Amino acid sequence: MQIKRLQIDDYLCLVDFDIVFDTVSGGSSTILIGENGAGKSTMIECILNILMSFDSPAIEKQIDYSYSMEYNYAQKAVCIVQSNHNYRITVDDVFCEGSYKRVRSFIQSHSLFPQRIIAFYSGVNNKLL
């Protein structure tokens, strides 16, 4: 999975947050370096919440911010946009929009997420566990 862009409207310290990652053919690793409190761990936590929300209705209900995430996975270009629990999911040129229940089945039928996600953090943070 290679994240290309992440936009968050208001999650903890990420307010009007918009980051574009450089992407290279064949994938690459990204390292986040910055001052304490800059939002590195918060961004990772937010990405994990987005990904886990499609496996857990309880996590989805906790997401009270709008977001957009563009990424490549398994030779597919994916864009997920959520605002007020209304979704628009685009996979290449195919899209689905609507409620959580509707888009969740679409996502599961298209295998849009990796089976395992690894986040490494060198400080103390109980939220990423």
Write out the residue ranges for each language-model feature:
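P-loop NTPase switch/coupling surface
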Residues: 1-129
